[in-house]
Amino acid sequence: MAIQLSDKPLLEWAGDTLAIALFEDAVELTGELASLDEKFAGILKELIAEEEFTGKANSTVFTRVSANIPVRKIILVGLGKTEAFNIDTLRRAAAAVGKVGKKQKSKVIGLSFPLWNNDPTASSQAIAEGVQLALYQDNRFKSDPDDKGSQVETVELLGFAGQEAAINRANQIVSGVILARQLVAAPANSVTPITMAETAQQIAQDYGLQIEILEQEDCEKLGMGAFLGVALASDLPPKFIHLTYKPESTPKRKLAIVGKGLTFDSGGLNIKGAGSGIETMKIDMGGAAATLGAAKAIAQIKPNVEVHFISAVTENMISGKAMHPGDILTASNGKTIEVNNTDAEGRLTLADALVYTDKLGLDAIVDLATLTGANVIALGDDIAGLYTPDDALAGQLEQAASESGEKIWRMPLEEKYFEGLKSGIADMKNTGPRPGGSITAALFLKQFVKDTPWAHLDIAGPVWADKENGYNGPGATGYGVRLLVDWVLSE
């Protein structure tokens, strides 16, 4: 699908489908829209009245029109109340239009949308992101794709002439989101530690990034006992991925994104039982997928910031070689961990990844992981939990979340709760009591970052959508890519 920019006035545009956005408290047609309605023989007013269109956010109405009008179809989309209007309103409205257009077999859609904050650059980028993400469909594993012949071919943004750079930026970011979606959606017999490393190598080759893949023996030399303990039972070799983007000039900042990379999680010897959702555990590498997606986008955008993309990738499987409940592992910073639950493995892999990253001399680290069900219980499916002792870093991520529309909520790091992780025979256990489980998980990770400002994002909820949700789903969302890109660019 192509995104095009048009300098044609609304009154002069002609084509297949015209989409017009209206606010909930301003559905009465005035000015240019009143003139357009007159040109269209009153069809807009008639559509609003007959369909009882109120302009509620993301609501749509559709009609086909007669041959003597210069468009064949009309879509009205609601923007909600003006006081609630934000940049993500445009993304979601564009997504709603794209879905209606696809359903109605529109080939070309002209979008007439207002500006957010009088900013044509941010507005056009958001609209382009929304419609592309909504129209993406993953047919890789279908022998007979179910959307043949119903693709929108072109979307024209009316009144946004000159915003080519913004559209290019949107395309770059969307390419990263789609990569993350594809990695998360693919089954564990398709995406493995080996193929994840190959994907990272392809990104490095395509966009000129530096790459280092640490093999098992390399990780052994670095003392990564926590990561390798998880990897013991898998027949597939673990891969420790380190991609680096370096700008041509001296970087303003040096940052790292660290993603949890379990390409399948059986639970280990604490196996996930019936009803546990074990069949969905291909998604447990959602953090690593977002990390690689962000790498792909940032490598194209080329900001003046050095960024390291790191993931310890393996499977958590069952075999005679598997780590046992009660085993003690030694992480690469020397801390010992009593494994009281083999199904709390992600934090073990992240422990060694964070120790490694902390030694790089960076200005900030953000890790993201499908870490705990407790975070989903607390915040639901749409919101990631943010855990950090650093107020400045929290503010940066909250601003990036506001701009990207990928929601986060700062959670407490209550140090007292670390008491629940104390072990009688090791430095700590890998899980604590059930209450505050997402907090104790974050406190566990905190033990492996010594010198660098650090934040943890628990993305267990928003990494996957069970049903359609704006420009996401159903399926893998690619959550985290846009948030992380905005964070890096804000630097």
Swiss-Prot record:
Keywords: Aminopeptidase, Cytoplasm, Hydrolase, Manganese, Metal-binding, Protease. InterPro entries: Leucine_aapep/pepB, Macro_dom-like, Peptidase_M17_C, Peptidase_M17_leu_NH2_pept, Peptidase_M17_N. It is found in: Cytoplasm. Binds 2 manganese ions per subunit. It comes from the Bacteria. CDD domains: Peptidase_M17. Mn(2+) 1 binds at D265, D343, E345. Its EC number is 3.4.11.1, 3.4.11.10. It catalyses: Release of an N-terminal amino acid, Xaa-|-Yaa-, in which Xaa is preferably Leu, but may be other amino acids including Pro although not Arg or Lys, and Yaa may be Pro. Amino acid amides and methyl esters are also readily hydrolyzed, but rates on arylamides are exceedingly low; Release of an N-terminal amino acid, preferentially leucine, but not glutamic or aspartic acids. It is an enzyme of class 3 (hydrolase). One of its GO terms (cellular component) is cytoplasm. Belongs to the peptidase M17 family. Presumably involved in the processing and regular turnover of intracellular proteins. Catalyzes the removal of unsubstituted N-terminal amino acids from various peptides. This is Probable cytosol aminopeptidase. It comes from Trichormus variabilis (strain ATCC 29413 / PCC 7937) (Anabaena variabilis).
